[in-house]
């Protein structure tokens, strides 16, 4: 939940508390001797349990920061896109995104995401403007707070279909769009 930032009309603060639950008795005395489990807490919301990716000795049954990163880009795009469609009188009746990100590791163990690709599959009600629905994906990227805050390319491969009897497949976008994050 955001709170208005004091003295700044259009600024909002977001807070999270992270608690590490991985001390197995000896802290971090060895790399293999501690757990990677943690909880993220937000006022008034359920805790989120997380861990490292299994390649970093994490629990594969828990979400990791990389999962959250890809999901935050995907969900921010979704919410921006739905708002734009509603304002443009485009009736979205279903939306799914098979988003993915590529993390490249350095020899020293660090690294960074190389890119994230969003693959939204959108179903529109009959009578909706399919061409405009395609175009709004780029506008949604420009409006997405998370995408505007990252320094990697966020690619878009939308598929859109009009809900009609017998037409069960989403059509691929006329082109794949690449939206670079702003400096």
Predicted regions and their residues:
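Extended beta-strand/beta-hairpin segments
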Residues: 1-71, 82-183
């Amino acid at each position: 939940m955001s709170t208005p930032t004091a003295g700044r009309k259009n600024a909002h603060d977001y807070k999270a508390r992270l608690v590490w639950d991985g001390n197995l008795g000896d802290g971090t005395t060895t790399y293999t001797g501690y757990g990677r489990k943690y909880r993220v807490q937000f006022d008034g919301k359920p805790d989120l349990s997380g861990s490292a990716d299994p390649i970093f000795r994490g629990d594969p049954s828990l979400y990791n920061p990389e999962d959250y990163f890809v999901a935050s880009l995907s969900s921010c795009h979704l919410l921006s896109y739905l708002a734009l469609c509603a304002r443009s009188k485009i009736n979205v009746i279903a939306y799914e995104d098979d988003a993915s990100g590529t993390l490249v590791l350095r020899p020293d163990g660090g690294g960074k995401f190389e890119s994230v690709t969003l693959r939204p599959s959108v179903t529109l009600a009959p009578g909706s403007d399919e061409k405009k629905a395609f175009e709004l994906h780029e506008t949604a990227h420009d409006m997405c707070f998370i995408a505007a805050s990252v320094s990697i390319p966020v690619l878009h491969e939308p598929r859109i279909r009009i809900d009609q009897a017998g037409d069960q497949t989403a059509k691929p976008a006329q082109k794949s769009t690449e939206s670079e994050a702003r400096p």
